[in-house]
Amino acid sequence: MLKKSKVKEIQEKVYEALKKANIAITPEEKENIEVADFGLGDLENTGLQLLVYVNTDRYCAKELVLFPGQTCPEHRHPPVNGKPGKQETFRCRYGKVYLYVEGEKTENPHCRPPKGSEQYYTVWHEIELNPGEQYTIEPNTLHWFQAGEEGAIVSEFSSHSDDESDIFTDPRIKRIPEIED
């Protein structure tokens, strides 16, 4: 569980990272930065910071901010209410992000899963994204990603985002963060 004071501290850190990458946000957006530790209490290794610009029934746009070596755990976006699941395009804006998807296993991948969670990382086809590069993930595709040494900022453009419906390989994960005073 995250403390409100820790969330404020991380929001400030994300704001500074976005500024460094020349991505301007409003004070209101700064307050709306979501800090997700996935219920594991190890934000430094397993976590993600998100800023949603828009999320309608038809499309979604957000920034994903990862600190150096931080990992968003393996998950997929399944079909929901007759819709095929979220299709998303990741475009790297700053740093480097290693994306792992279904497909032929990459020999000698750059990343390792967080210690103690290795069994919950099953897809190993590596895609390296540098600033200006992008990759589209099809609906219901297992994927996970990890920031490089300087961290990463990734713009996500997708169909409707319904994070509550995401299915994570690790049964311990809680997608929606719990915040305490």
From Swiss-Prot:
Domain of life from the UniProt record: Bacteria
Pfam families associated with the record: Lyx_isomer (PF07385)
Cofactor: Mn(2+)
Summary of the function given for this chain in its UniProt record: Sugar isomerase that catalyzes the reversible isomerization of D-lyxose to D-xylulose, and D-mannose to D-fructose. Shows optimum activity using D-lyxose as substrate, but can also effectively catalyze the isomerization between D-fructose and D-mannose.
Family classification: Belongs to the D-lyxose ketol-isomerase family.
Subunit and partners: Homodimer.
Protein name (record): D-lyxose/D-mannose isomerase
Organism (species): Thermosediminibacter oceani (strain ATCC BAA-1034 / DSM 16646 / JW/IW-1228P)
